[in-house]
């Protein structure tokens, strides 16, 4: 299975650092976030990687090269203008092939074991969900006892999308080149009953601010 890492964002909330450094190359305890993800993927047996980029993307290519230094292979999908999540994945589909692939947000840190991920026959997506963080208390989806993902419920019990998933290329059938979001495609597939999920109860941080980067460094220090 191949993996795609989304690395095209500008990292607005991490300014001024991201004015000169793309967010995936920001270091946590001396190692760039994206390098930590690639090493975790390799440990899980996933060593064929696709990375999209836009803002300061040449720095990402210069640092990671062809991936051989990390024990894998990297194909890049550069974007002249950011295409949002859905458009970026759609542009990269020729590099990903016709089989399901792993998808990771480039600014997430987690102890999730990627080797556990799979997509059941007939499903279009499998989402890893986490407890709602303080900055996103309402959550994104509901996970039922059978492992099926549904829309959020007013009664509560909702979870947050972790930025870790398995997608089938068929999710993008009918899409056209250009910028578009991933969420509407997922919600359409959810309505069709074709999205599964799991609840990761381990460590997970969406490294979107300097404060959350400090949290990751604290967690890494605890396990050093």
UniProtKB/Swiss-Prot annotation:
Signal peptide: none annotated. GO terms for molecular function: metal ion binding; nucleotidyltransferase activity. Pathway: Cell wall biogenesis; peptidoglycan recycling. UTP binds at residues 11-13, 23. GO terms for biological process: cell wall organization; peptidoglycan biosynthetic process; peptidoglycan turnover; regulation of cell shape; response to antibiotic. It comes from the Bacteria. Its cofactor is Mg(2+). Its EC number is 2.7.7.99. It catalyses: N-acetyl-alpha-D-muramate 1-phosphate + UDP + H(+) = UDP-N-acetyl-alpha-D-muramate + phosphate. Disruption phenotype: Cells lacking this gene accumulate MurNAc 1-phosphate. Deletion of this gene increases fosfomycin sensitivity. Growth rate is not affected. It is an enzyme of class 2 (transferase). Substrate binds at residues 105, 140, 206. Gene3D superfamilies: Spore Coat Polysaccharide Biosynthesis Protein SpsA, Chain A. Keywords: Antibiotic resistance, Carbohydrate metabolism, Cell shape, Cell wall biogenesis/degradation, Magnesium, Metal-binding, Nucleotidyltransferase, Peptidoglycan synthesis, Transferase. Mg(2+) binds at residues 107, 206. Catalyzes the formation of UDP-N-acetylmuramate (UDP-MurNAc), a crucial precursor of the bacterial peptidoglycan cell wall, from UTP and MurNAc-alpha-1P. Is involved in peptidoglycan recycling as part of a cell wall recycling pathway that bypasses de novo biosynthesis of the peptidoglycan precursor UDP-MurNAc. Plays a role in intrinsic resistance to fosfomycin, which targets the de novo synthesis of UDP-MurNAc. Monomer. Belongs to the nucleotidyltransferase MurU family. This is N-acetylmuramate alpha-1-phosphate uridylyltransferase. It comes from Pseudomonas aeruginosa (strain ATCC 15692 / DSM 22644 / CIP 104116 / JCM 14847 / LMG 12228 / 1C / PRS 101 / PAO1). The lineage of its organism: Bacteria, Pseudomonadati, Pseudomonadota, Gammaproteobacteria, Pseudomonadales.
